[in-house]
Amino acid sequence: MNKYYPTYLQTFVLFLIFIPCILISVLLVLPFASIENGIGLSLISIISMLLTVTAGLALRKDWRLKISLFPLAIIFLSVLFIIGLHILLDPLNEIFPAPESLIKVFRALLLQPYAAFFYIVISAPILEEVLFRGIILDGYLKNYKPWQGIIVSAFLFALIHGNLAQGLGAFGIGILFGWVYWKTNSIIPSIILHFINNAVAFVGMLTTPEEDINKSIREFMDNNFAFSMLYAFSIIIAVGSIWILHKKYLSKMSVERAEPKEELTIDT
């Protein structure tokens, strides 16, 4: 039985392709920029991801991406959930702080804020969404049960961040993005949400003193009672936004194209 690209095994091969893509991007960038500054790091990340996305689309033999109209309320409710999720994960961020290697990368990026902005806020959301939702999840939705594909693709999305501090949030957000992609049949909502999430993170990086970059929200507030109230409110926000998102919007959208079928073919 023919299947859509990619299957789980084909995704593993695609991740192996990512390794030489990194090496190629380093060789291309080194003559013009150091890999220790923001411009060099940004260029290497962008080129390696672009090469991987190109390989994925070529192997799929279909360069089209899903684009459909969707209610803007989906963006608003999803942003509320993301805010609530980040607050709910704050205690775990205290237990698993960002590694020093990641802090060094952030410092290098912020030395060239314009390059960092283009990489973090513009290119990363587009390229990562095309790879993880437009290619990987799109294949999973056609080959496997929807929620199985969403969870596996979210795990891979978390894994590529390379550390537990970012991975926890990336997994939760990856599930949200995958759910929205499945129901809306469009890659645009997840790209917009990724833009917003990364833009907020970028502003936080710029405005936070270097010595405080690993501080949790609770440590910034320095008031356990106030943080407890905020934490309780974030539960209400996260649960409420997801409930409304499901009941009023996503549950009413057609998912016919994402259901597993007996026979699947690849467009050529």
Residue ranges and their predicted role:
Residues 166-222:
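Functionally important transmembrane alpha-helices
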Residues 1-15, 225-229:
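N-terminal membrane topogenic signal
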Residues 12-58, 232:
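Alpha-helical transmembrane segments in multi-pass membrane proteins
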Residues 7-22, 74-85, 152, 235:
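Alpha-helical transmembrane segments
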Residues 127-152, 179-186:
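Membrane-interface helix/loop boundary segments of multi-pass membrane proteins
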Residues 13, 123, 152-156, 168, ...:
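Hydrophobic residues within alpha-helical transmembrane segments
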Residues 197-268:
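C-terminal membrane module of polytopic membrane proteins
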Residues 36-39, 61-126, 130, 138, ...:
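Juxtamembrane helix-loop-helix connectors linking adjacent transmembrane helices
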